[in-house]
Amino acid sequence: MEYTFNKLTKKDVKKLKVGDIVYLNGKIYTARDEAHLKIIEMLKSNEKLPFDLNESIIYHAGPIMKKVNDSWVCVSIGPTTSARMNDVEEEFIKLTNISAIVGKGGMKKELLKTFEDYGVVYLAAPGGCAALLANSVKRVDNVYFLDELGMPEAVWELEVNNFGPLIVAMDSHGNSIYEEVNKKVYEKLNELIGL
């Protein structure tokens, strides 16, 4: 199935299955390694975040931005390898109540239980399409922690339109396209070498 969402709610997440195609409109936030750690640290210290991540979409990306007059313009925004956030993502999800993660390469299969328990979906963005994805960024609404973390690690609040195509690669029902592919590869390998 193919879906377009203006806001991806937990109810919407439950409808999505591995292999579905998704396009996003509305607000998304970038967050890589350092941003994840900063957000976790703040929330565990009972500090209020300067943005609301409840039922939001996090994009594992370190964009290239350009300042034009008083506004930021997105030049490039390709996905970061999500496995870099494997060790902190469970705690991040529990603390923030996000709805979706957009990234590249998937995440460890142990997170499928967390996705199921908290109603989260992992959407795979196509690698090598950073300039194309930047065309879907209609506006940069804000940037957080820029001075502290630097451009790629800062949290960028973006308004996107027709952002995609994204593939549901890990759903909230315990399914992973990566696990399915691995299983098929090993079955074929066993056929070929006669195990």
Swiss-Prot record:
Substrate binds at residue 104. It catalyses: (2R,3R)-tartrate = oxaloacetate + H2O. Keywords: Lyase. One of its GO terms (molecular function) is L(+)-tartrate dehydratase activity. The keyword Magnesium does not apply. The active site is at residue 36. Its EC number is 4.2.1.32. InterPro entries: Fe-S_hydro-lyase_TtdB-typ_cat, Fe-S_hydroAse_TtdB_cat_sf. Heterotetramer of two alpha and two beta subunits. This is Putative L(+)-tartrate dehydratase subunit beta.
